[in-house]
């Protein structure tokens, strides 16, 4: 017999550094999920990844207090900042405040990596989404 789903929870957790402190602890604790069990499982699943990389995770918890989780790709903004070698986007994007530049080849690489998480039919559509995110951060797309 299949387990009865009690609900889902979406969090963004840094790879390899899940711990029971806020925001993870309270979010899981109030739903009756074993916090330490999740932290151990998540850290084990992300040990090969770059430490500190933000990982969106969807946790499905069941009425018997068990859970499963699905990890997604890091956000597009993380990849854009990494490729452009910047700490943060422009404070005034679109008003002359440029944070940096990124090439079409870099945009394609990011789009291909994020393809399964984006709502795009093909790579060109995914590239358009990534370019839009880049422009909203104040990055100039060249090439």
Swiss-Prot record:
- InterPro entries for this protein: Ribosomal_uL11, Ribosomal_uL11_bac-typ, Ribosomal_uL11_C, Ribosomal_uL11_C_sf, Ribosomal_uL11_N, Ribosomal_uL11_N_sf
User: DNA-binding as a keyword?
Assistant: no
GO terms, biological process = translation
Signal peptide start and end residues: none
Q: How is it modified after translation?
A: One or more lysine residues are methylated.
Keywords associated with the record: Methylation, Ribonucleoprotein, Ribosomal protein, RNA-binding, rRNA-binding
Query: Gene3D superfamilies from the entry?
Result: Ribosomal protein L11, C-terminal domain, Ribosomal protein L11/L12, N-terminal domain
Claim: Ribonucleoprotein is one of the keywords in the record: yes
Q: Which GO terms describe its cellular component?
A: cytosolic large ribosomal subunit
- A single GO molecular function term of this UniProt record: structural constituent of ribosome
Q: Quaternary arrangement and interactors, per the entry? A: Part of the ribosomal stalk of the 50S ribosomal subunit. Interacts with L10 and the large rRNA to form the base of the stalk. L10 forms an elongated spine to which L12 dimers bind in a sequential fashion forming a multimeric L10(L12)X complex.
The protein's job, in short, is: Forms part of the ribosomal stalk which helps the ribosome interact with GTP-bound translation factors.
Q: Which family is this protein grouped under?
A: Belongs to the universal ribosomal protein uL11 family.
**What name does this protein carry?**
Large ribosomal subunit protein uL11
């Amino acid at each position: 017999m299949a387990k009865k789903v009690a609900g889902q929870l979406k969090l963004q957790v840094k790879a390899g550094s899940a711990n029971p402190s806020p925001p993870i602890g309270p979010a899981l604790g109030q739903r009756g999920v074993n916090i330490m069990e999740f932290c151990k499982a998540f850290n084990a699943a992300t040990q090969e990844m770059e430490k500190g990389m933000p990982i969106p995770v969807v946790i499905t918890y069941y009425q018997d207090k068990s859970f499963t989780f699905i990890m997604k790709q890091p956000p597009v903004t993380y990849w854009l900042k990494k490729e452009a070698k910047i700490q943060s986007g422009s404070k005034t994007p679109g008003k002359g405040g440029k944070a940096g530049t990124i090439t079409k080849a870099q945009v394609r690489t990011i789009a291909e990596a994020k393809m399964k998480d984006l709502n795009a039919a093909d790579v060109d559509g995914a590239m358009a989404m990534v370019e839009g995110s880049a422009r909203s951060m104040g990055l100039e797309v060249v090439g």
